[in-house]
């Protein structure tokens, strides 16, 4: 029973661990489900923007950390028993080295490049260096394999996705932009999420903005509870409500069906 609980916790937090199969696939199932879905998405080599839209699960994702608001965001998520995913900028880990391990208690972690440059302006070799350096820093800080990648500004093309896929990372975008990076007020952030949220949504937020953290506490998490939506990490969303091939090929339109 204890091993089953460990497996469930692993999928919830995005920890990619396989239990020994000798005691049966039922016990290894949750982590295996994540690995199978990651492998499928890597073969398809298309950006993920949402889940399959067939569940009550939603994924809150936070870019550009770690930073001064990271601890507060974690406390707010913990009080609400909520899960999330943090896409980390490699160079920031030098200033906040302990944050990634703390984030793992409630969240999955992803690669958001080392310098947060527009990858469309870089050659493939430089893109690879950005991703490899950040992945190595996160894995050194946590001991956990990084399998998710998000390009800064959402600026991407098939070549960028191919570099990430060759490194074993699934490219993840979003279906809801909270507009917090544009300077939206905390009330406007909450209103934007409220207008679009549904089961299967992937929400773009930023953990280095005070107005975002306030919106998370006072508007977004209460809204999700009121609508009976459940926050999960991205690996859990992908395993429990995976997007179809047709959705992936349709891009953003595939999240509006």
Identify the residue ranges that each predicted region occupies:
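His/Asp/Glu-enriched short active-site or ligand-binding loop at hydrolase and phosphoryl-transfer sites
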Residues: 155-197, 229-241
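C-terminal region of N-terminal signal peptides and the immediate post-cleavage residues
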Residues: 15-32
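Active-site beta->alpha N-cap acidic-glycine motif
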Residues: 29-146, 230, 239
